[in-house]
Each structure stands twice: as C-alpha cells, then as structure tokens.
C-alpha cells in the first residue's frame, strides 16, 4: 500500500482507514459482579469474514488469579511509532484494576494463541 510506513501504526486516521482490515480482535472478559469465582480472561475473536471460524472465539487465555478486573489493555508500541522499523506490536499489556497485577501477553509468533509472558505480582 503506497504511502504507508514501516512501523506498527499509522501517520494519520486516513492512512489507517486505507490499511487492511484486522483479522483478529482481542477483548477482555471479566466476571466482576456476577458471583462467578473464575479468573478473568482475554478472548481472541476471528473477525475475518473469509475464515471458517469467523465471529467465533478462537482462543481464551485465563489470568492466574481471581478478581483482577482486567481493564484498559494496550500494545507495547503505539501508532506514533509508525516510522520506526525496529518497533512491532508483540505484547499486550493488560492491567487488573482490583488486583494491581499487570499481565504481559505475547502475541507473536501466533496471534491466535496468546501466551502469558510475564505476570508481575502486586505483592
């Protein structure tokens, strides 16, 4: 795609609109307030309309503890790094607002099957 740069983001909203559509979506699933005593998890959803598993949860990654209340996840590299070849979106940072745990999730080499890389404890 002409005009797009080499890093993990985009220089402008119009450049992002011209980019290829996402094929996977990561979303937080929490049990806070439900009475269910299970760990929160990150769900990977297939959003590629050409895929056989389109619109399905293709992977669930449970957190190690109960009651984290996962919130406001983000990438290790933001869109302002669009001109930096050395940057890539390899990790998702997912904090627990009730536990103060920060989960570092590895999205490469298999973005469908997230791995826990590091789970620093609040203790």
Describe the residue ranges of each PLM region:
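Structural motif
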Residues: 36-41, 100-104
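Surface-exposed loop and turn segments in beta-propeller and other repeat-based domains
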Residues: 58-71
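Structural signature of eukaryotic scaffold interfaces centered on beta-propeller domains
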Residues: 2-20, 72-88
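Short loop/turn segments immediately following the C-termini of beta-strands
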Residues: 30, 95-97
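Hydrophobic alpha-helical segments, chiefly the membrane-spanning helices
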Residues: 119-123
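Conserved small/polar residues in nucleotide/adenosyl-binding loops
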Residues: 106-111
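Beta-propeller blade signature
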Residues: 43-46
């Amino acid at each position: 795609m002409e005009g797009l740069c080499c890093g993990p983001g985009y220089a402008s909203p119009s450049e992002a609109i011209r980019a290829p559509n996402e094929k996977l979506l990561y979303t937080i699933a929490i049990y806070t307030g439900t009475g269910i005593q299970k760990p929160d998890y990150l769900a990977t959803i297939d959003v590629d309309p050409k895929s056989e598993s389109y619109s399905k949860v293709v992977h669930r990654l449970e957190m190690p503890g109960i009651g984290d209340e996962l919130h406001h996840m983000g990438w290790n590299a933001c869109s302002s790094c669009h001109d930096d070849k050395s940057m890539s979106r390899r990790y998702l940072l997912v904090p627990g607002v009730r536990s103060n745990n920060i989960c570092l999730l590895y999205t490469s080499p298999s973005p469908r099957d997230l791995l826990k890389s590091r789970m620093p404890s609040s203790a």
